Design a protein with these regions (language model features):
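A structural microfeature
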Residues: 28, 61, 148-149
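A residue-level signal for conserved active-site and pocket-lining positions in enzyme catalytic cores
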Residues: 7, 29, 52, 82, ...
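N-terminal glycine-/serine-/threonine-rich beta1-alpha1-beta2 phosphate-ribose binding loop
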Residues: 36-78
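Active-site-lining helix/loop region of Rossmann-like oxidoreductase modules
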Residues: 178-237
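Donor/substrate-binding cores of folate-linked one-carbon enzymes
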Residues: 21-22, 32, 81-200
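N-terminal Rossmann-like dinucleotide-binding module
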Residues: 1-39
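An anion-binding loop in the catalytic cleft
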Residues: 213-306
Length: 306
């Protein structure tokens, strides 16, 4: 099948690799523009662009598709199907209607749950036991199209968003490669989403990553897992210092007041209904360290307030 691929980050690059490996004809790739990265602001190509160029595939990087400026080019490419994975640009109706088989999108949640930019992170932040991937037939809405195929994945009790993202990427690439030939064969039955049960997964930011020791063990534990690797959960100590928490474990307590140090090896602190072991932290202005070293640096002892 002649496919036009649209995508930008690592998950899209892995899906594109899988489509190449499956022998599909990728007529062209659309991706976001190169952007400055890092402290030195080095102009860097999106992962999808790098994969496409390795395979000699034409790459297009328009600012937008919504103004119709790319319609003629896409029509000339004559794709039978457009595959979209985390592209970052909205497809107008004029593009959605161009290919014979329309446009499909890989979304890393069990739609209609977690429509939006950060479905993997919100599934962990909310303490869900499972998530999944969905392949949908795109329409003009935000992740509202009929679902062609979905597959569930269990979420581990200590799994971070980063770890889960690696797994859904692999599953998503596989499922996508199974769906494409099924579309050509006409063996799929699109299932309309239950819009009444839709939930949203908005983009994360650094301010959202804050938690308080007065909150529940479950909330803090989920927040630390869900904000890993970015933007990284953090709290403010009684002394006004910001501390990022990379890894933690939930433990029982004896009802001590939130913020009370329960132990220092490893550093364990009381919260609303239990205790949290702070296993890996990044104190404000310092390098990452384990919680025990952090406690030693502050000369904390059991009974102190962090």
């Amino acid at each position: 099948m002649r496919i036009l691929f649209m995508g930008t980050p690592d998950i899209a690059a892995e899906c594109l690799k899988a489509l190449y490996s499956a022998g599909h004809d990728i007529c062209a790739v659309y991706t976001r523009r190169d952007k400055p990265v890092g402290r030195k602001q080095v102009l860097t190509a999106p992962p999808v662009k790098e994969v496409a160029l390795e395979h000699g595939t034409p790459v297009f990087q328009p600012r937008t598709l919504r103004d119709g400026s790319e319609d003629a080019n896409i029509r000339a490419l004559a794709p039978e199907l457009i595959v979209v994975v985390a592209y970052g640009c909205i497809l107008p109706k004029s593009v959605l209607e161009l290919p014979k088989y329309g446009c499909i999108n890989l979304h890393v949640s069990l739609l209609p749950k977690y429509r939006g930019s950060a479905p993997v992170q919100w599934s962990v932040l909310n303490g869900d036991a499972e998530t999944g991937v969905s392949i949908m037939q795109m329409d003009e809405g935000l992740d509202t199209g009929d679902v062609l195929r979905c597959e569930k994945l269990a979420i581990g009790p200590e799994e971070t968003s980063g770890e889960l993202f690696d797994r859904v990427t692999a599953v998503g690439a596989r499922v996508l490669c199974e769906v494409v030939p099924a579309i050509a064969a006409g063996t799929l039955t699109p299932q309309p989403q239950d819009h009444a049960n839709a939930t949203l997964a908005p983009m994360l930011n650094k301010e959202m990553a804050e938690f308080r020791l007065t909150e529940s063990v479950a909330h803090i534990h989920n927040w630390v897992r869900g904000m890993n690797p970015w933007p990284c959960a953090w709290f403010v100590t009684s002394g006004g210092k910001k501390v990022k928490v990379v890894e933690c474990r939930a433990v029982a307590s004896q009802g001590e007041a939130p913020g009370t140090v329960l132990a220092t090896k490893p550093l364990t602190v009381a919260c609303a209904d239990g205790g949290i072991q702070l296993l890996q932290v990044v104190p404000e202005g310092k390098k990452p360290m384990d919680g025990t070293s952090f406690a030693a640096g502050l000369r904390l002892k059991a009974g102190d307030v962090l």
